[in-house]
Amino acid sequence: MKEIGLEGHGISPNAVSEPFRLFTDEAVQQIRAEVFSEEVLKDCRFASTFNKQMVRGMGPARAPFTYAAWNSPELLAAVSKVAGIDVVPSFDFEVANINISVNSGGKPVTEPKKDDGNPLSDGLSSVAWHYDSFPFVCVVMLSDCTDMVGGETALRTSSGEIMKVRGPAMGTAVVLQGRYIEHQALKALGGRERISMVTCFRPKSPHVRDETVLTGVRGISHKSEMYTQYTEYRLEILEERIRAKQKSERTRVAARRPFDTEEIRQWLNEQKAFIESTLEEMTGE
């Protein structure tokens, strides 16, 4: 974050990673089999202005391998190490978002356009500039990128400059602190298909600031299911914070330290803000 002028922003000093291996080719094929199963395609397809073909909310029943993989201790340790903070999937509906683009007439592109110094001069932006709804995202490529050119992520620094981050190859991942960095995806040219898998993450500790919003996913979700999972995890965070505060208060009493009115008022106001931010996301739209 310091290198792009955003030191102190977000919940981790790490902004974005280079691609790293996260899934084997065999694991990718198993995930693809679940994504393109009849049940998933029937119940879990969505579209938005960003992407006309998405699969979301597969859940453990329809996609047991995908769900188990993203919740495995080994994968969580790998993603947390790259993120620079312990993270967990935001909630089940975000395991995972599959973006599907198929070009039946696609011709391989072997030579990229000349770089004239403007990273976006070719006009090949795939998604508009935006901030993510969740603190971190992990993007995994599920397609063979051999004949593809492009597909990078463009980041806007605090000075307004544009940086490009190389996109992942099949089975590799890129981790981005997208809630706090303005970014956009650039189009990939060549190849018959481009299928990417995006899983959203939040801090594991209930005591770390969590500024998750539902703005970007409310219109592409089964709301009852999503709101149930969102409410559950927010209440769990609140419960753990209250239990921790109760424990610290008992310790204070046992040590015969005086009651700190200002400290407890500050803590209560923090929980009030947390509840109010949760309420703001629970819209009827």
Labelled PLM ranges:
Residues F93, G123-P135, E161-I162, P168-A169:
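A short beta-loop-beta micro-motif enriched in histidine and acidic residues
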Residues I98-H130:
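Conserved short histidine dyad/triad with adjacent acidic residue
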Residues F259-E285:
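C-terminal non-catalytic accessory extensions
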